[in-house]
């Protein structure tokens, strides 16, 4: 007879016997995935450093913004000049167009996508780059600038938790409209690693699927992603499906090991509607019983016994590093920095309290019946 440990179902009252062998097997699978990822390849040069790049974008920016309401938007040709670590300027051709969904239509300064020429960027800081998403302030003003910093810190938090995350790089970007229809301005923005590049770096493949079935998800990776979403109080995501008519999944890129499409790994992105960022336009989904976006509400799936506990232990193991990220950043104004630090601290206080974990995390998991069916087939 195999030795066993006792854990509990979501109500905390029914004992569930879980073999240690199963937990060891799950941990071994996760270790293999992480080892494969770490051995896959290095990050491209742009994402090997955390220093802020200084750059100037000269392009018909006003024309690009004028297309924001169009489904088909043309790339506008321009120039990208950046300074390297030695202060030497480098000029690259670039094309731009607006991107995104909500922010593209709502924001005065719609997000841009950069399109570089692969041959031209060879042997530069942008070597290997083709298309890059830019996350920038929604509107002019210091308050909107702080929102960009907070979203950048959300990405950095996920990078601390797992390599299975999008790389980012800050840019002090000056915008110059080549038609002189807009006055020049400068903002702190960040660029995000291309999804195909991320998959290649991790030695995984990107899946273009309509939806994920409950039993197709990599449980440890999914549980970790869902705890991260709780940490930043983000409910604007799904690991099961995308918006109607779109590929899976909403604000989650789906990756899988080569040859194993039934071990799907969700990679979160797009955090402007999170409580951490707390943008003026953010509001909780009407489907969950909270009024304020800053209120944390767990929307994760139910997982086999031990999976969520292991994910919480992994998050706790990164606690000091995460808190140091928010304590040491020079990019936040003092009041915002203090309130943000406290907000992150409150998440770890939740994890420290077993009764709250049972009530606010385990007790709110979704798909209990689907989990029972999945376990009955194993």
Kindly give the residue locations of the regions a language model identified.
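Acidic, Ala/Val/Gly-enriched low-complexity intrinsically disordered segments
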Residues: 5, 9, 13-18
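Positively charged n-region of N-terminal signal peptides that target proteins for export
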Residues: 18-24
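Short, flexible active-site-adjacent loop segments at beta-strand->alpha-helix junctions, enriched
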Residues: 21, 30, 196
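Bacterial N-terminal signal peptides
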Residues: 25-35
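Phosphate/dinucleotide-binding and metal-coordinating scaffold of catalytic cores
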Residues: 40-378
């Amino acid at each position: 007879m195999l030795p066993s440990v006792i854990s509990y179902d979501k109500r905390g009252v029914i004992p569930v016997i879980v073999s240690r062998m199963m937990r060891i097997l799950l941990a071994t699978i996760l270790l293999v995935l992480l080892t494969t990822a770490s051995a896959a390849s290095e990050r491209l040069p742009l994402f090997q450093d955390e220093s802020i790049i200084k750059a100037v974008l000269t392009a018909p920016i006003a024309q690009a913004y004028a297309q924001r309401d169009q489904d088909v938007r043309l790339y506008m040709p321009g120039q990208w000049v950046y300074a390297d670590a030695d202060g030497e300027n480098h000029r690259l051709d670039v094309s731009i167009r607006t991107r995104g969904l909500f922010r593209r239509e709502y924001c005065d300064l719609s997000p841009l996508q950069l399109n570089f020429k692969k041959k031209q960027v060879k042997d530069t800081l942008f070597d290997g780059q083709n298309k890059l998403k830019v996350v920038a302030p929604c509107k002019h003003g210091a308050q909107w600038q702080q929102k960009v910093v907070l979203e950048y810190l959300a990405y950095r938090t996920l990078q601390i938790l797992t390599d299975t995350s999008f790389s980012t790089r800050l840019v002090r970007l000056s915008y110059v409209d080549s038609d002189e229809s807009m006055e020049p301005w400068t903002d702190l923005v960040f660029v995000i690693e291309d999804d195909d590049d991320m998959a290649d770096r991790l030695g995984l493949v990107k899946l273009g699927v309509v939806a994920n079935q409950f039993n197709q998800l990599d449980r440890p990776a999914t549980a970790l992603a869902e705890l991260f979403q709780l940490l930043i109080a983000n409910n604007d995501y799904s690991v099961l499906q995308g918006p109607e008519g779109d590929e899976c999944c909403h604000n989650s890129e789906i990756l899988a090991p080569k040859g194993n499409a039934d071990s799907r790994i969700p990679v979160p992105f797009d955090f402007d509607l999170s409580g951490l960022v707390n943008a003026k336009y953010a509001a909780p989904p009407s489907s969950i019983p909270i009024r304020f976006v800053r209120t944390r509400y767990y929307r994760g799936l139910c997982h086999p016994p031990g999976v969520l506990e292991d994910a919480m232990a992994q998050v706790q193991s990164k606690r000091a590093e995460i808190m140091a990220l928010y304590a040491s950043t020079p990019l936040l104004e003092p009041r915002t920095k203090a309130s943000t630090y406290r907000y992150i601290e409150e998440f770890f206080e939740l994890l420290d309290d077993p009764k709250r974990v049972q009530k606010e995390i385990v007790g709110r998991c979704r798909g209990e019946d689907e989990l029972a069916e999945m376990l009955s087939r194993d």
